[in-house]
Amino acid sequence: ETGVNCMDLYTPDPDLRSRVGRALRGRREQFVLQAHLCTVWQNGQYKATRDIGEVRASFEDVLRRLETDYIDVGMIHYVDTMDTWNTVANGEVMRYALEQKRAGRIRCIGLSSHNPEVALAAVESGLVEVLMFSVNPCYDLQPAGENCEALWAEESYAGMLVNMDPARERLYETCQRLGVGITVMKAFGGGDLLTADSPAGVALTVEQCIHYALTRPAVASVMSGVHTSAELAASLAYETAPDSARDYAAALATFPKISWRGHCMYCGHCAPCPKGIDVASVTKFLNLARAQGMVPETAVSYTHLTLP
């Protein structure tokens, strides 16, 4: 009814899966479904697993409960360490995912991670077509690590932070260059960024967080986690919000312990250019070319730029 057509189903909760399946009856083709491999429901609780028997059973369950014969994105769940990635990439989980893709039951293979170094390895392997990654202006400042809880730990923001972490910047640029789409999780930092107790020390709005994520290279969609209809409405308000409400640059400039000086955030806040140049897009393409050392495949996008 509101135009939402992309949905992430990380949870293996059988009741939720069945409810979604009933809601999609007669209109499955109108939706892009991202469902996770390696999650199971045991004793009324979610559990991550790499046991191939459990992975197979859970995937069959999600197809049955969603009343469909395919998933658009089969997302390999929660790969935050290099050891886990190596196990997945060279083991039964990836073989199963590839098998399901060949059978047409998975259209694209994805991987979810909070660690930019692991995510980059997955993207560069050529095995992954979609990356689910945590993207927001606070997490983007943090270095790569295998403990995702450090991303929201208070001590991680105790000192002065300057500009985006290079590993994260490289990840986004590589995804753009290789054509790997990013679906965003944690755009609001689990809600932490929307309050005055935010790690940044300043509350951001839903519109600002969504716009920040959507202006990163390669980002295709933001998966807004919602608990209520009101929270869903708040995210949907982004679609009709004016540019002034989406603008996050002024808010980022007020962060007491964070500096973005000398780093383009692709926010467009410097507009209008007296020469009519789309500075944000041109700078993004420049950074992509610098990262690759040559004019990248994304040069085709240059044709969409408006000439002054």
Where are these regions (language model features)?
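Active-site groove signature of glycoside hydrolases
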Residues: 66-84
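Beta/alpha (TIM)-barrel catalytic core signal, keyed to glycine-rich beta->alpha loops juxtaposed to Asp/Glu
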Residues: 1, 79-284, 291-298
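Structural motif corresponding to the early beta-alpha repeats
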Residues: 26-53, 76-80
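Conserved small/polar residues in nucleotide/adenosyl-binding loops
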Residues: 303-308
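Acidic (Asp/Glu)-rich catalytic clusters
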Residues: 21-29, 64-67, 123-126, 177
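An active-site-proximal structural segment forming one wall of the substrate-binding cleft
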Residues: 52-66
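N-terminal binding-site loop/beta-alpha segment at the start of enzyme catalytic domains
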Residues: 1-37, 102
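Glycine-centered flexible beta-alpha turn that most often forms the glycine-rich phosphate-binding loop
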Residues: 7, 71, 109
